[in-house]
Swiss-Prot record:
Protein family: Belongs to the peptidase S10 family.
Taxonomy of the source species: Eukaryota, Viridiplantae, Streptophyta, Embryophyta, Tracheophyta
Complexes and interactors: Carboxypeptidase II is a dimer, where each monomer is composed of two chains linked by a disulfide bond.
Name of protein: Serine carboxypeptidase 2
GO MF: serine-type carboxypeptidase activity
Organism whose genome encodes this protein: Triticum aestivum (Wheat)
Length: 444
């Protein structure tokens, strides 16, 4: 039985949680009665004195990775998880200082989201994920009616480079008056397969992590493939590239890899093994980790944590909670090769669209994003300039007619994990619809 209203979803307190000045809610929304698909959400509200703040839906990618695991627990969420999952620490740069942040685990089978139709996890794809997410939103606003008509944004990273524009398009086309969509933001996201491949391989070669021969081979084998369903020739070329890259963190080129050894292959310190375990298109899945991921895995498998979150209530999830679902990831179905047509439609509709990129990510690197956005052919209103945070260069930005591109200096794939302060600055400017701040005049 769906609880009446949102009060039943209020989180009293999470195990090991510090005292806070904001409310949290979590629970399930059934998106397909027939199939028994139910999506899990976590809402971290802004404090009372920041209200009425906008509502922002955050989506992680994969496909098959949990927004609770990544976004909420090691990036922009209110807390970071302590080693061994022993408790939580307040994140000084949490995004719910300035917005009400809603994390959604999707599709069903990811994180705490579940389905009673076991075949669902073998048949997921972009289209059903978008429609289920839309169904989730429509019902969520009924459970939280005080958020109806509130300024609403959709944001996400990585494979959410598909989810975010696809869901934004559905919301925009639905003309649902309750959902007041103002814009979207994508970080280190897949945008256009061809341009993303071109930019990714160029970045690898440019940063000296593949040989000249392999660079040529990657371009010959992969450029006309789908990112999600590469050909055997492209797979073989990326295997060679992976061997050449060695044991580095492709999600954050210049930070150490986690060296906690563990029996499972996904947490093995051998990167080639780690990447193989993440499916056929190795640079899309999983996430940056010197070990933060392990802490989340320990924490969210605690029964007291699940009870506090109203998650896995019946104990029906007879499997270990995981940050990502390999099954969903390796059996992904429809994945359009380009989001550019959606960008064009939503730019024309006047939505606020920002694309940001951590410039040390080698998985969906800045170069890929610059080529993909360049392919839109938008006129420039402010050309590439350095933006500043506390008189230091935080990154660079270019403002186009209808779209703002921002790089974040020294950040990997998960920008708020690596550069939490700069990420919060970026988020605040996005919400205000103001360009990133240039050098202040009075600086020495």
């Amino acid at each position: 039985v769906e609880p009446s209203g949102h009060a039943a979803d209020r989180i009293a307190r999470l195990p090991g949680q510090p005292a806070v000045d904001f409310d949290m809610y979590s629970g399930y929304i059934t998106v397909d009665e027939g199939a028994g698909r139910s999506l899990f959400y976590l809402l971290q509200e802004a404090p009372e004195d920041a209200q009425p703040a906008p509502l922002v839906l955050w989506l992680n990618g994969g496909p098959g990775c949990s927004s609770v695991a990544y976004g909420a627990s090691e990036e922009l969420g209110a807390f970071r998880v302590k080693p061994r999952g022993a408790g939580l620490v307040l994140n000084e740069y949490r995004w719910n200082k300035v917005a009400n942040v809603l994390f959604l685990d999707s599709p069903a089978g990811v994180g705490f989201s579940y389905t009673n139709t076991s075949s669902d996890i073998y048949t997921s794809g972009d289209n059903r994920t978008a429609h289920d997410s839309y169904a989730f939103l429509a019902k969520w606003f009924e459970r939280f009616p005080h958020y109806k008509y509130r300024d609403f944004y959709i944001a996400g990273e990585s494979y959410a480079g598909h989810y975010v524009p696809e869901l934004s398009q559905l919301v925009h086309r639905s003309k649902n008056p309750v959902i007041n969509l103002k814009g979207f933001m994508v970080g280190n996201g897949l945008i256009d397969d061809y341009h993303d491949y071109v930019g990714t391989f160029e970045f690898w070669w440019n940063h000296g992590i593949v040989s000249d021969d392999t660079y040529r081979r990657l371009k010959e084998a992969c450029l006309h493939d789908s990112f999600i369903h590469p050909s055997p020739a492209c797979d073989a070329a990326t295997d060679v590239a992976t061997a050449e890259q060695g044991n580095i963190d492709m999600y954050s080129l210049y930070t150490p890899v986690c060296n906690i050894t563990s029996s499972s292959s996904s947490s093995s310190s051998s990167l080639s093994q780690q990447r193989r375990s993440r499916g056929r298109y190795p640079w899309l899945t999983g996430s940056y980790d010197p070990c933060t991921e392990r802490y989340s895995t320990a924490y969210y498998n605690r029964r007291d944590v699940q009870m506090a979150l109203h998650a896995n209530v019946t104990g029906a999830m007879n499997y270990t909670w995981a940050t990502c679902s390999d099954t969903i990831n390796t059996h992904w179905h429809d994945a359009p090769r380009s989001m550019l047509p959606i960008y064009r439609e939503l730019i024309a509709a006047g939505l606020r669209i920002w694309v940001f990129s951590g410039d040390t990510d080698a998985v969906v690197p800045l170069t890929a994003t610059r080529y993909s956005i360049g392919a839109l052919g938008l006129p420039t209103t402010t050309s590439w300039y350095p933006w500043y945070d506390d008189q230091e260069v935080g990154g660079w930005s270019q403002v186009y007619k209808g779209l703002t591109l921002v790089s974040v200096r020294g950040a990997g794939h998960e920008v708020p994990l690596h550069r939490p302060r700069q990420a919060l600055v970026l988020f605040q400017y996005f919400l205000q619809g103001k360009p990133m701040p240039g050098q202040t005049k009075n600086a020495t």
